[in-house]
């Protein structure tokens, strides 16, 4: 883990979680279970490899680093090997990436350049999660434009949309041979950004609402895989808070 973190340098991909999910196809064959006389259905197994990365910041010191080595220089061969060998790579984009400048009045304000996004796609990133406390740094218009810029670069934005209902909607990232859904939510307060559920926003679903949403997905398809990505916790702390454990 230490080596991986150092290779990404200032990009701040804080965590790599590689998930190998066994997915079963629907074409099974009957086999007898030893000693029982019963026939069980067996399925060929396919594996889906999903990498979930942490914060990806494209401002401050990272902006300076890009000016020195270019955005491709932020990715080491070992990171490329991990990302490009995976089916999907989901990263938390910790800044709006837009030419729009409508700064929200808050302590830390970030912004990345849209022309950097295609490089993220080239290096294997497929989905960018916007359900965090910095996606709104350039206002609601900057948030919507960030979504559009992500799509133009060939990736899929998660956790933000034209209103809260759309922002919180689960996203199907893989349908076959077994559905994989991603549910995202920001569980931190937004600084000087009013909660207006009918306006462009990031997903801020409550814990109770998240539980019900996951339960509905599970009832609809008990074989699906559900990934819940939460932006929460206390910065610079390595242990979960009591509320997170609950």
Where are these predicted regions, by residue range?
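Bacterial N-terminal signal peptides that target proteins for export
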Residues: 2-14
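Bacterial N-terminal signal peptides
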Residues: 12-22
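Acidic, metal/ion-coordinating pockets
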Residues: 26-246
């Amino acid at each position: 883990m230490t080596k991986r973190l150092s290779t990404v340098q200032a990009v701040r991909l804080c965590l790599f979680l590689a998930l190998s999910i066994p997915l079963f196809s629907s074409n099974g064959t009957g086999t007898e279970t030893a000693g029982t006389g019963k026939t069980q259905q067996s399925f060929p197994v396919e594996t889906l490899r999903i990498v979930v990365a942490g914060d990806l910041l494209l401002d401050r010191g990272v902006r300076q680093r890009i000016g020195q080595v270019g955005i491709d220089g932020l990715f080491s061969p070992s990171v490329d090997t991990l990302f490009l060998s995976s089916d999907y790579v989901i990263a938390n984009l910790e800044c709006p990436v837009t030419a729009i400048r409508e700064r929200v009045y808050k302590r830390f304000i970030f912004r990345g350049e849209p022309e950097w996004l295609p490089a993220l796609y080239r290096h294997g990133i497929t989905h960018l999660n916007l359900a965090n406390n910095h996606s709104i740094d350039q206002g609601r218009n900057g948030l919507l434009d960030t979504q559009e810029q992500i799509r133009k670069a060939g990736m899929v934005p998660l956790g933000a949309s034209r209103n809260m209902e759309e922002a919180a909607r689960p996203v199907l990232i893989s349908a076959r041979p077994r559905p994989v859904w991603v549910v995202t939510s920001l569980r931190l307060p937004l600084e000087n950004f009013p909660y207006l559920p009918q306006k462009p926003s990031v997903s801020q679903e409550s814990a109770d609402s998240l539980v019900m949403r996951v339960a509905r997905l599970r009832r609809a398809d008990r074989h699906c895989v559900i990934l819940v990505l939460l932006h929460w916790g206390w910065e610079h702390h390595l242990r979960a808070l009591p509320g997170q454990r609950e």
